[in-house]
Every structure is written in C-alpha cells, then in structure tokens.
C-alpha cells in the first residue's frame, strides 16, 4: 500500500513541478519553441524550486510533517490554477503524438526497433527496482542518512564526523521530502524519472548539434549503460547533475550560434544548479567557463564592456543559484567548501 501511495505522491509532485516551472519560465520569458523542451524545463525548474523551498524551511521554520504537507497542498492548488488552461491536456496529446511518430520511425529500421524495445524493457526494470528498499552504500550513508538527521533535529544541522556533511544537498531535499512524509520509496521513484529526463536532455543536446537520429542513439546508449541502470534505482543525485550539465551545454551551444542572451542565462542557471547538487559541479563550472571564454575569444580581444560583462554575469548567475548551500557551510563551519578549503579558511572540524 505504501508503494502505491508513494507512486501517487510522485505523480502529484510531478504536477506541482511542471506547474511551478511553467510559471517561472513564463515570468522570465524563457519559454522555448519546442514542446519537449518546455516540459523538461518546466519539471526541472519546478523540481529545483521545491528543493530550495524545502532548504529554506530547514533554516527557518523547521521540518515538521504538518508544515511540509501544508506547503505541498498550497503548491498543488497553485499548480492546478497555473495549468488550468489545458497544459496537462496538451502534455497528454504531446505524449500520444510522440508515440505515434515513434511507431512510424521504428518500423523503418530493425536497429531502431531493437533499441526501442531495449530502452522500454530496461526502463520498466529500473522502475520495478526503484520500489525495492535502498541498499546502495552512498544512499544509506548520506543521500538518505543526512536528510534523516535533518528531520530528526527538525532543521538543517552540521555534524563533523563525516566528510559528506559539507557537500551541497540540493537534490537530496527531495529525499527529505519523501522521508518526512513517511514514504521511503518516493525518492527512488523520482530518481528513476530523473534517469529518463537525463536521457531526454542528452537527446535535446545531441539532436541540436547533429540530428534527431543521432540524438536518439546517444540517449539510448547512455540510458543502457550499467552505471545509469544502477543509478536509476537509487537515491543518489548523479542523474540530476547529468541533466543540469547536458542542458547547460545545450543552451551554451544555442547561444554561440544565435547570440540570444536568454539562452546564455539559462545555461548559467543550470551551471548554478550543477554547483548546488554536488562538489563535482565545480568541474563542470570551470569547464563551461573556459568554453565560454573560448567562444567569446574574438570579442574579448576588443576588451569592450559588453564582452567582459558576459562572463561576469554568467558567473554571477551561477553563483547566486548555488550560493545557499555554500553560505550554509560558511556559517556553520567557516569554510564554504568544507572540508576542502581548510587550508584557506582555517575552518573548524578538520
């Protein structure tokens, strides 16, 4: 029974994410032209907004089941008002139409048919595996354990006995959501969905550079790798990180060809979300920053205010998006990247 409730809760949360994300995209004028992008961006923006809401509850009001249920109820009502114009009906129509087009495509190639069957079977198996109790060491030691400590203390705290207490836990806020409501399988259902979304974001990236068929092959081979299959039934944050990285690169490439600032700022937002998800996001932040400098190199030689402003604004947006977790670390330990900055910040507990 708990598994069924977890699934229903996941569906409701997905609706909330899409509704909130759609509103954010509309507010900033970031709605893309392709429907697939709209749905993916809406979910990821809504997902991130909920993660930050849960974070700020933990540093202010405190974690109680009544507060979380009240917030979710309010967000669900708000989402239905946002989506009342038929957005969900359009989503269903889009899925049906995509399936029809998918059937037409796969009948033209035995290879596409084989890959299509493979990804469907694997996704179903991953979905079933997501309902098993968590056994992964990292999930049990901090992806689920640290949010459980937050729940026990009813706020975001710091304990110095384990290095992972200092890492950004943006994605783990959804783990906390499931745990505090009493549905331990919920985080794994959401992470299963993140596996599919990360494959779709790779498709969006690859199809923009090459072709739709190339994007399909890239997404399928990515999703069928053993690592992604393993991650799809855990509570880890890697799949969320991959989604942010793929979209950050995608919008950077779009900006390089069209020079539309909104696509560059979208790239910056997803870079910031990558930084808020794991310390490994720094690897991506440095890489995409170097990529931006290379793309802008000809303009940088002119040293105009505009060419200098672009990298600075990009970095500022990324920093602001990721900053809550690093500010939290600085307040609690004196080291924003605890424990790795101890030699610079002379931080505590190390």
Predicted regions and their residues:
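Transmembrane-helix motifs of polytopic, lipid-linked glycan transferases
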Residues: 22, 48-51, 76-83, 186-209, ...
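Perimembrane helix-loop-helix junctions
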Residues: 101, 284-318, 326
């Amino acid at each position: 029974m708990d598994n069924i409730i977890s699934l229903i809760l996941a569906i409701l949360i997905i609706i909330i994410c899409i509704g909130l994300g759609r509103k954010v995209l509309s507010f900033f004028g970031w709605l893309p032209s392709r429907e697939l992008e709209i749905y993916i961006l809406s979910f990821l923006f809504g997902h991130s907004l909920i993660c930050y809401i849960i974070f700020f509850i933990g540093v202010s009001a405190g974690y109680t089941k009544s507060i979380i249920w009240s917030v979710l109820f309010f967000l669900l009502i708000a989402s239905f008002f946002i989506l009342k114009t038929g957005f969900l009906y359009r989503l269903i129509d889009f899925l049906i139409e995509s399936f029809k087009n998918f059937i037409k495509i796969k009948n033209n190639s035995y290879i596409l048919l084989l890959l299509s069957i493979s990804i469907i079977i694997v996704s179903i198996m991953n979905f079933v595996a997501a309902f098993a109790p968590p056994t992964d060491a990292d999930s049990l030691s901090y992806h689920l354990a640290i949010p459980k400590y937050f729940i026990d203390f009813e706020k975001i705290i710091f304990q110095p006995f384990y290095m992972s207490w200092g890492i950004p836990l943006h994605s783990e806020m959804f783990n906390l959501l499931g745990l505090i409501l009493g549905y331990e399988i919920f985080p794994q259902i959401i992470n299963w969905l993140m596996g599919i979304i990360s494959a779709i974001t790779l498709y969006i990236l690859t199809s923009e550079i090459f072709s739709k068929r190339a994007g399909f092959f890239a997404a399928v081979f990515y999703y069928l790798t053993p690592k992604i299959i393993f991650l799809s039934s855990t509570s880890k944050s890697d799949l969320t990180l991959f989604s942010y990285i793929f979209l950050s690169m995608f919008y950077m490439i779009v900006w390089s060809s069209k020079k539309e600032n909104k696509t560059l700022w979208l790239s910056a937002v997803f870079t910031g979300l990558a930084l808020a998800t794991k310390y490994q996001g720094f690897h991506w932040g440095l890489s995409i920053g170097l990529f931006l400098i290379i793309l802008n190199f000809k303009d940088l030689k002119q040293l105009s205010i505009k060419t200098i402003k672009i990298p600075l604004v990009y970095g500022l947006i990324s920093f602001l998006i990721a900053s809550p977790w690093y500010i939290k670390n600085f307040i609690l330990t004196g080291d924003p990247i605890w424990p790795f900055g101890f030699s610079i910040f002379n931080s505590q507990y190390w």
